[in-house]
Each structure stands twice: as C-alpha cells, then as structure tokens.
C-alpha cells in the first residue's frame, strides 16, 4: 500500500515537498526529525519564477536561507564530527531553537508559491534549490515524452535535456 504525504495533507509532515511512501516498510534516518516514513520517493513541486534574473536570484536566496536553517535544525551532533564542527552546529541549533521547524517549512512553501506558475516564463524546483542552475524555461515541462532509462520506458519532461544540462552541466 502506498501513501502520498505532504505538508498540505498532514500538519506534522516535516518537508517542503511531497513523498510517496510504501506503508509496508520503515525508513530509519539519522536525523533530529522524528517523523515516521516508509521507503519513499520525493515529489518536487515546480514553482514559478520572476523573469528578471536579479529578482530570481533574490528569490532563490530567501529559500536557500530557510533551507540552511531547516538543515541546521535537523542535523544530529555526532562524535564522528570534529569538536569544532559540533560546537558550531550546537550554537546554530541554540540560535534557531525558537524557530519552529513547521514554520520554516510553511514559510518556504509560501515563498516558493509567490510567483504564479501559469503566468511565469521561468520555473524551478524551489523546495531544494540549487540556485540559478535550477532556473529553466517553463516550456521544458509543458509536455512529456517517453524515454528509455536502464531498460525501462518512463515519462520525462519534453525538455529534460535542457533541464538536466542546466542543473548538472554535461551529464
């Protein structure tokens, strides 16, 4: 049995993107987030961006800042890390103690949806932003095509090559 989980469906869900999970499994993650999940795949939303590149970069920066705080809150302090790194993480965790994790996830989602997808010429996955490399023309996602991947056929965005090239370069 599979289940879709997302912040829009469950207030306790701790990520700014959805997942499809297998309810017959249990995923053990080394994190300060205590949310039960089965083995899962991520579902990343594609959100609109402003046409102006400087505004777009500023938009990415807001999301990246929140992502950094979110990651700081969920990372575990461990003896496998140096004392100095653990000390820096601990100070960061103390400084962000009063910021609820859910607030960060909701704020990321709110900011990501600021620009209407339908009215945007450029789009991106803002839930895990890689900055300007993620920015791509909306036409990349307007249709899908079937492609062969490791012996199986899958649907992919019609402009998958442009999208992957923007993110990874010569993939």
For every predicted segment, state its role.
Residues 2-51, 56-60, 71-81, 85-169:
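Conserved catalytic core of two-metal-ion nucleotidyltransferases
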Residues 66-68:
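Mobile amphipathic helical/loop "lid" adjacent to a hydrophobic cofactor/ligand pocket
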């Amino acid at each position: 049995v599979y289940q879709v989980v997302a912040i829009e469906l469950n207030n306790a869900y701790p990520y700014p993107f959805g997942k499809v999970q297998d309810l017959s499994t249990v995923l053990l993650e080394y994190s300060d987030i205590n949310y039960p999940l089965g083995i899962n795949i991520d579902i990343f939303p594609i959100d609109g961006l402003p046409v102006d590149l400087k505004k777009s970069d500023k938009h990415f920066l807001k999301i990246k800042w929140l992502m950094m705080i979110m990651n700081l809150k969920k990372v575990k302090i461990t003896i496998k890390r140096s004392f100095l790194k653990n000390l820096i993480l601990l100070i960061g965790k103390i400084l962000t103690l009063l910021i609820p994790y859910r607030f960060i996830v909701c704020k990321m989602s709110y900011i990501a949806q600021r620009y209407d997808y339908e009215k945007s010429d450029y789009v991106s996955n803002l839930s895990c932003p890689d900055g300007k490399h993620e920015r791509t023309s909306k036409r990349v996602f307007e249709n899908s095509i079937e492609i062969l991947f490791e012996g199986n056929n899958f649907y992919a965005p019609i402009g998958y090559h442009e999208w992957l090239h923007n993110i990874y370069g010569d993939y």
